[in-house]
Structures are given as structure tokens and as C-alpha cells.
Amino acid sequence: MEEKITYKNAGVDTEKGREFIQKIKRNVESTHGPRVIGGLGGFAGAYDVSVLKKYKHPILLSGTDGVGTKIELARLLKIYNTIGIDLVAMCVNDILVCGGEPFFFLDYIACGKLDPEKMDQIVSGIVQGCKMSNASLLGGETAEHPGTMKEDEFDLAGFVVGAVEKDSMIDGSTIRSGDKILGLESSGPHSNGFSLIRKLLLKEGKYLPTDPQQVKFLKDYALKPTRIYVSSILKLLQQVSVKGMVHITGGGYQENIPRILPQGTQSKFFKEKIPSGYFFEKIKKDHKIEELELFATFNMGIGYMVIVSEENAELAKKIMESSGEVVHEIGEIVSGNKEEVQFV
């Protein structure tokens, strides 16, 4: 008997997709507050923006990002419950740079074949990240791509929307020579530099090492989720005038810091004040990579930076430390070419 031609035979199991939605529904809806209208599964996510009435002149902020090739490391290690946190962190930390409070988050997951257990773990991480950011997981899409992705392959993208008061929006325009740079410690490489990490630490750049200690190092240090700085920074902004902020992501110091500096200013860092931590010290020790290349690739132990006037530096540091952050005064602003970064 001739086999029936169906969508399922072509590689897309819509019934399994519906079951997956039911499986994650309660978890996703645990991020919903009174602003979310309706539940999961509709054509659109609905969010009550009457909250904007508390703003004199609200500015909406949006951001989108992924987790890069850190996903490949998670796939090899079969650990899926942390990269969802990474996904949220990469987005919310970006709009936070402008002083933005996240409102809601959306996710997109593409996979070769839907594995409900694996996807449930990924979504659980996204839910955890949303709770840490006080953002609602308003909706998402999980798409099977049979024939174009291998069955165990997947990729993630995240999208966040938030708001900031226009007069409170932080754009770096008031930064001046003499201002201090405070660095908030990272948890490790966060979600950047993983193409280099895989080249250095995986066999042929794509297989797990055979040494169990090296595998443990990858699990314990490389795969640690990206820190979410939302609550600490929003608390700081209520009490201290902040001139500029930087989320250290792809391109490290050299690519990210110039993005918020006015012309005629330059960042100067004191290397001995930057707590690179075990992961980066091991990379530096075990592999012949120039230090400047490391700073141009990784966060080197500092995931987020806050620029304040000299007189506000100590107070800002204390406030962030009271929120549980580990903070270091790692540099200052000097006169010079904003595109160049000094390390002394």
C-alpha cells in the first residue's frame, strides 16, 4: 500500500508541536503579570501599555540578539537549561545600557527536529531569565527545519521591548575627561568569543575533549550563564546620576566602549584592577594569545561598565555592591581618540 503523503512524513510533526506548547504553558505564564492580556497560544501576545502613563515622555526601547556558537557547546555537553538565561541576558542588558526597564520578551527557536524535553529545558532557562529581569515572556515561535538543519541542531533568537523616560535616557553625551569607569564582574565569557573558545578547547574545534577534567572546565566555567544586571542597575539609576553604560559583548573592549563615548574622549583602563578570573587566566596561560586580542574578544572578567563622575563613584559602587554585584574601579575617561582604548 502506498504511503500517505503528509506534513509529518516531510519532517514536521504539528501534533508534537501542540503537545510542546501545552507542556511549557504553565511555566511561561508564570512570568505573566497583570499587564499581559490572555494566555499562550494566540496569534499575538497582548500587553497593556497603560504603564506608560507614569512616564512624562516615554521612549520605547527594543533589542534582539542570540547566543552565538555557545549553543554548540551546550549541544555537545547536552546541557540546555542555561542558554535560555543567556538569550534573555544578551537582550535585556543591551536595552539597560540606555536606562531601559524591560517589559516583555519574545523568543524564536529553530530546530532540525522538535525534541520536547530539550526544548522544555531551553524554555525553562528563558523563563528564569525573564523572572530575573522582571519581564514577561509574551510569546515565541518554535520551528522545525527538516532537511535544512540536522535533527539535533537548533538556534535561538530573542527580542525584548522596554521603556525609558526621555529625560532619563542614557546616551553617553555627558561623559567628560576625569569620569570614572566602574566594572561589574561577569560570570565568565558570557555569550561571546565562543568561536575562539571552541577552536582552543574542543578537538578539531568541534568535538569534546577526552580528558574529563577539560570537560568539567567547559561545564563549570565556559557554559556559565550570562549575568543579568537589570535589578542592580535600575536600583542604581534611582539614586545616582549615571553618564554612560556599556554591555561588554562581541568585540570586547575595543568594539563596545567607543560606542557610547563622545568625540574627544577616550577610555583608559588599569589592567591590574581588572579581575580576569580563572577562566581567562587559564586561557591566557595555556594558549599563546596576545593580551590585546583577548581584550578585543572577551569581557575579561567584566561584563558591564558604568561611567560616573568622580564624586559619584564611591556611592555608585556601594549601591551596586548592596545589590550583590562585585564592582571594581577599573579605569577613567581621558582626552583622546574615542576609537582607541588605552591599557596601562
Curated annotation (Swiss-Prot):
Positions of transmembrane segments: none
Keywords: ATP-binding, Cytoplasm, Ligase, Nucleotide-binding, Purine biosynthesis
Pathway stated in the Swiss-Prot or TrEMBL entry: Purine metabolism; IMP biosynthesis via de novo pathway; 5-amino-1-(5-phospho-D-ribosyl)imidazole from N(2)-formyl-N(1)-(5-phospho-D-ribosyl)glycinamide: step 2/2
Source species, domain of life: Bacteria
Catalyzed chemical reaction(s): 2-formamido-N(1)-(5-O-phospho-beta-D-ribosyl)acetamidine + ATP = 5-amino-1-(5-phospho-beta-D-ribosyl)imidazole + ADP + phosphate + H(+)
Biological process (GO), any one: adenine biosynthetic process
Family, similarity comment: Belongs to the AIR synthase family.
Name of the featured protein: Phosphoribosylformylglycinamidine cyclo-ligase
Gene (name only): purM
